[in-house]
Amino acid sequence: MFNFAVSRESLLSGFQWFFFIFCNTVVVPPTLLSAFQLPQSSLLTLTQYAFLATALACFAQAFCGHRRAIMEGPGGLWWGTILTITLGEASRGTPINDIATSLAVGIALSGVLTMLIGFSGLGHRLARLFTPSVMVLFMLMLGAQLTTIFFKGMLGLPFGIADPNFKIQLPPFALSVAVMCLVLAMIIFLPQRFARYGLLVGTITGWLLWYFCFPSSHSLSGELHWQWFPLGSGGALSPGIILTAVITGLVNISNTYGAIRGTDVFYPQQGAGNTRYRRSFVATGFMTLITVPLAVIPFSPFVSSIGLLTQTGDYTRRSFIYGSVICLLVALVPALTRLFCSIPLPVSSAVMLVSYLPLLFSALVFSQQITFTARNIYRLALPLFVGIFLMALPPVYLQDLPLTLRPLLSNGLLVGILLAVLMDNLIPWERIE
């Protein structure tokens, strides 16, 4: 039975949860706006869709899924993959409507597949493929891809096709770097009781400083126009994009295991049964499926929630649900959406960059479960460097590849993970000294 008793501490923790959910969500719509070449007036609709879907997904997990204080939001793997596919295919002349339609079909299929994994209990077997070595690579490459996105946001770089006339504005970038340093300083140097509010303080301070330094900056414009498939629809289907989306959905299950396993220490009385994973998969798949018409980034439990739980020391669902309720209110009231979305992208990107730097620590924790030698290091080195190479490869050089393979091979993160899964599970590394 859920306890709805309200206290000052739970409300404060709930507000902290809201800003955590908010900052992880608000950075996404502007990148989609840029990547899919939409007018600025569409940003309010995309942002409200994102807040609404994220709040409902958090409720679904809190009451019907894993039932823990773990944020369910736009998955970083999905986000990076969608931006990579869109940029790569658009640069080759593929119509935006074709990209959006194919992604919608692939995301819907992955949602159904995730639900089937939950209903059937196959997730436990698939989890065995994600060995510690694979998770080291996953954390390193996901961190590299996401921090690239956040640095782009800090610099104000476009997320779509490169604009030759674009120039970096140094004063806004300098302010975003100052916000990043403020959050880092709070986390590193202040006592734990103050450091846990670094994200909150950094966001509000950066917000105020931005409008003090750049008072002419425009606010969120446009009216709310509810519509299905705002990124585009009715285009031709691309088997390669659909296949890449389905594979992304399969790889995305690693986030569920990482988040639930990582929070076991906070909920020792709940045990480690398979039922919790099955419910979480069903909730993730269901929310991914029903929100396809809203064109939001598909969901996954956030492993970074572990850091927030550690910082605040509050593991209760109550505070998490309070934060989700505030997020829902922001989604339903356009005036609140406009207010909170006036937080500039460089500021929110700087705060989120700091929150994702600990992915390196997660990678190092997984690496401690492996004994690397001069002979078995190739299980990590080859997938890692192949993935990094493909991440840096300009999309134009893949122009002549078959349409079925092109979206997958242009995604260094996915290729690196798949190569690591194959090498780690097909080669008997335990026999190699």
Swiss-Prot record:
Family, as annotated: Belongs to the nucleobase:cation symporter-2 (NCS2) (TC 2.A.40) family.
One term of GO molecular function: xanthine transmembrane transporter activity
Stored InterPro entries: NCS2
Residue intervals on the Periplasmic side: 1-17, 64-68, 124-130, 191-196, 252-288, 341-345, 401-407
Upregulation: By glyoxylate.
Signal peptide feature range: none
Organism: Escherichia coli (strain K12)
Side of membrane Cytoplasmic, spans: 39-42, 90-102, 152-169, 218-230, 310-319, 367-379, 429-433
Protein name as it appears in the record: Putative purine permease YbbY
Gene Ontology biological process terms, A to Z: xanthine transport
Keyword DNA-binding: no
Taxonomic lineage from the root: Bacteria, Pseudomonadati, Pseudomonadota, Gammaproteobacteria, Enterobacterales
